């Protein structure tokens, strides 16, 4: 799955206007997370319960230095040595609208830099927004996190398409300052949410470092997942087109923090 943004520059945008249509070109980075997937096809069937709950299975992946056996555990060579097997390992996971929520981290359109409005906004229009629309229509909880505009003059407004979901009651907009981690976890427990699928910006900053971000949510009783095509990093000066920082961040997330989900896999399932 190629990342869908790299070096795609739009015309200058006023903060929070709708980004123009994006056309892919030869400068776009090719980063196929799933090229090494030689596993069998999984059943993409979506089932609907009597209560309207949708359930479906997705193939996810994570990287491990240690060999992972068929039971999902380690093979011990001795009391002090574990068999190694540097590789991606695949996990077929059951998701449902009852136990899975989507998180969109800081999808701002009022960054203090127009370039970031264009760069991250292009990703949102191409992948993040369509996925959230599909998730909401399927009955999934969609949670959008941002700063409280009462406390900040910028980095608060979310992109227009996501704001429309909030206005229509199809997504929740939560302010970071209102939701310390313990309160957020209690909310998830009350709503029966055990799985969190993360998207948003930036992958190497807020997505992992916020109190409700991936790194801080490890070990809190929730299964964590990340859709890298619905995110992008704060790159170095010379890597905006190649997305090298996002690639490295995705690897780190997939290695020790969350299982990765392919955008096309989950989008196609939810659109059924």
Language-model features, listed with the residues they occupy:
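Sec-dependent signal peptide recognition
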Residues: 1-6
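Short, low-complexity, disordered segments immediately C-terminal to signal peptides
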Residues: 17-28
């Amino acid at each position: 799955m190629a990342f869908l943004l790299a070096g795609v520059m739009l015309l200058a945008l006023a903060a929070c206007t709708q980004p123009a249509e994006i056309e892919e070109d030869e400068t776009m980075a090719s980063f196929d997370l799933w090229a090494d997937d030689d596993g069998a096809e999984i059943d993409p069937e979506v089932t609907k319960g009597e209560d309207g709950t949708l359930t479906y299975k997705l193939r996810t992946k994570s990287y491990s230095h240690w060999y992972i056996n068929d039971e999902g555990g380690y093979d011990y060579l001795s009391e002090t040595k574990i068999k190694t097997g540097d590789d991606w390992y695949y996990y077929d996971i059951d998701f449902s609208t009852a136990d899975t929520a989507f998180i969109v981290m800081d999808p701002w359109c009022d960054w203090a830099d127009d370039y970031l409005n264009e760069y991250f906004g292009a990703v949102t229009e191409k992948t993040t927004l369509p996925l959230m629309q599909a998730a909401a229509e399927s009955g999934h909880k969609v949670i959008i996190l941002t700063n409280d505009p009462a406390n900040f003059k910028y980095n608060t407004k979310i992109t227009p398409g996501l704001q429309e979901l909030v206005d229509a009651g199809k997504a929740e907009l939560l302010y970071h300052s209102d939701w310390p981690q313990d309160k957020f976890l209690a909310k998830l427990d009350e709503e029966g949410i055990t799985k969190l699928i993360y998207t948003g910006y930036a992958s190497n900053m807020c997505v992992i470092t916020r109190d409700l971000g991936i790194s801080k949510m490890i070990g809190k009783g929730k299964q964590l997942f990340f859709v890298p095509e619905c995110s992008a990093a704060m790159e170095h000066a010379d890597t905006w087109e190649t997305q090298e920082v996002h690639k490295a961040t995705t690897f780190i997330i997939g290695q020790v923090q969350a299982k990765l989900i392919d955008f096309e896999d989950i989008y196609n399932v939810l659109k059924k």
